[in-house]
Amino acid sequence: MEIKVLHQVMEWNEDVSAEVRRTLKDHKVCLINVMGSPGAGKTSLITALIAKLREEFAIGVIEGDITGQIDAEKIAALKIPAVQLNTDGACHIEAMSIQHILPDFDLDSLDVLFVENIGNLVCPAEFDIGENLRITVLSIPEGDDKVAKYPPVSYTHLTLPTT
């Protein structure tokens, strides 16, 4: 007997991510999933994008971490709605977590919602969270082989800025 647990988890996540995508579409919110290794510059990229976009777009941020709220506090200091999402050890954010946290935002007053995913190049790339765009931040000190070593970060993402 073969039990395909991972397959079932992925199918379930796809169903929930489709619901998240529909909800955000109904509210005209663009969800941007920002991924990268710890220290690659995800928070720095998001704060730079906030500085460039805030005059034209209403922005919110979901800060994903295993624990703590350091990055969420940095974003909140910019007067941007920010909600901390701690995974308590999980290496990625799933669509269900996004679905549960959306009511913490006034979606009718947002245009763009950034999700700073967990600092990891492996797991987050495998999970659709209902995003419209995926950005992976790669840093030069990590080496030039990340795309070759972690193919999902390159074939599932539209943008690969390097810090």
Spell out what each predicted region is.
Residues 130-148:
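Conserved Switch II/interswitch segment of TRAFAC-class P-loop GTPases
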Residues 34:
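Hydrophobic anchor at the beta1->P-loop junction of P-loop NTPases
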Residues 45:
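Hydrophobic positions on the alpha1 helix immediately C-terminal to the Walker A/P-loop
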Residues 6-19, 29, 49, 53-128:
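Nucleotide-state-sensitive switch-loop elements of NTP-binding domains
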Residues 42:
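Conserved lysine of the Walker
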Residues 31, 114, 135-137:
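Structural motif
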Residues 38:
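The conserved Walker
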Residues 156-162:
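Conserved small/polar residues in nucleotide/adenosyl-binding loops
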